[in-house]
Amino acid sequence: MGLERLACVVQGVGSLFDVDTVRNITNKVSEIAGKHYGDSDKTDISLRVITDHIRSTVMMICDGVIPSNEGRGYVLRRLLRRAVRHGKLLGIDKPFMSDVASTVIKESGGAYPELVEKQKYIHKVIENEEASFNKTIDSGLAILNDKIAASDGKELSAADAFQLYDTYGFPIDLTLEVLEEQGMTTSREEFDRLMNEQRERAREDRKKMGDLGWQ
């Protein structure tokens, strides 16, 4: 995105978000959400997060990255899911990322023609991941909020955080972000220990099933 950083100088603006091509993406999110940049600090943060993450998302998918649980695919998945959650914070209750991606492609397609060539594929990847995450986020957030309400207001138990991940598929990084917003914490070290124990149990179960297959 070096061209847009150069545009900061050419257009005489102090922030990447004030460059016209980037501002148009933010305006698209504002239009969908019915919110305006400058309404509040929380609104501005969410608008910036979505704008930043959808730009990165579109470029990564165009480069051949797909959402997964490891490597660059995990980074992409986190970007997409964090943007979707900030959409929820803005009151957006329908799939919207593909619409915003269209604006990214429109604004950047001249400099990056491959975005236009691959736009159908880009939309498909985004739509599939957003649909998958929407099934998780609403129920997960409701359960997390219940657990926060029942806590001491300072720390969520690692066992609760792990249950959200293991049983409901709610990502730990999203749990940590919600807790931070509430001024709370959880033990990542204890969460990782529980995760490792679960993986070890799964390995043992697979081994037992394999042994049974030879009997």
Where do the protein language model's features map onto the residues?
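A glycine- and charged-residue-rich anion-binding loop/surface
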Residues: M1-Q215
